[in-house]
Amino acid sequence: MIKMFVMPTCPYCDYVEKQVEGNPRFEVIDISKHVHNLQMFIDLRDNNPAFDEAKKIGDIGIPCYVLEDGTVTLS
């Protein structure tokens, strides 16, 4: 299953969330819904080099995808 970290106020997240709606291969995790979700995302963002460029330019790094093999991608 592909995990997708999103937030409703992010326009890019809204777009991709609609694209995967109803697809059982995706688990959509809203980081604004519960502090546990936010903590999972922060841990990922703080420890994964996939976020280095996003952090350099001041982006949050969502939407973010964690593929089945553990690969993290922002695209």
Question: Which residues make up each language-model segment?
Answer:
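Thiol-based oxidoreductase modules, predominantly thioredoxin-like and allied folds used
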Residues: R25-N47
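A short, hydrophobic beta-strand/beta-hairpin element that forms part of a small beta-sheet core
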Residues: G61-V72
